[in-house]
Amino acid sequence: TFAAKIIEQKVDVQWTGELKFEKSLLKDDRIELLYKSGCRKLIFGLESYNQRVLDAMKKGVELSWVDDTSEACMKLGIAMHFYLICGFPTETEPEVMDSINFVLNNQRLLDSPGFSAILSQFDLERGAPIEKNPAEWGITKLYTPPEHDLSLGYTYETTIGMSSDE
């Protein structure tokens, strides 16, 4: 692995990586290996801290992996950044609040050196899998307002969850 090669070649470096929360990160002290190789920050596309929403996104992530990985990083001193999305089709306001509260009510996470998070609004872009079958996500209408004729994305109407305006 990249981390093992850095250690093997005795390269003295600090580095940042972008990862997905995966069960394999929790095996064989892999996070510790990352730290020993110089990793000091990991950036994760968490997207949501709600299992139903993660499943709808087809992320293939379990919340327990998020918790366990975060705990391991905090224990070792690896800073983390979480990208979060709100307004994914079918997502409800209480589900968005699960993500917000995961961060705001987790004092240990907030106090961990270098922690950061950003919450961005979901943008349905042209060519995304949702565009091919919008009804699967409760989307009844996709459109681009005339004043956004150069937009790469869509505005949409939905029968489930929050609208794109919400």
Predicted ranges, named:
Residues R52-M57, C86-P94, L110-D165:
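Flexible glycine/acidic-rich beta-alpha junction loops that bind and position SAM and/or redox cofactors
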Residues D29-R30, P89-N106, E131:
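Catalytic cores of alpha/beta
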Residues F44, F82, V103, A117:
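Hydrophobic, well-ordered secondary-structure elements that form the walls
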Residues G17, F82-L84, L119:
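Structural beta-sheet core signal
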Residues V11, I78-Y83, S99-I100, E147-Y156:
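Short acidic (Asp/Glu) and glycine-rich catalytic loops that position anionic groups and cofactors
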Residues L26, W65, E95-D98, E166:
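Soluble or luminal CAZymes and related metallo-dependent hydrolases
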Residues I7, N105-G114:
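Alpha-helix termini
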Residues T1-M80, E91:
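Conserved SAM/AdoMet-binding glycine-rich loop
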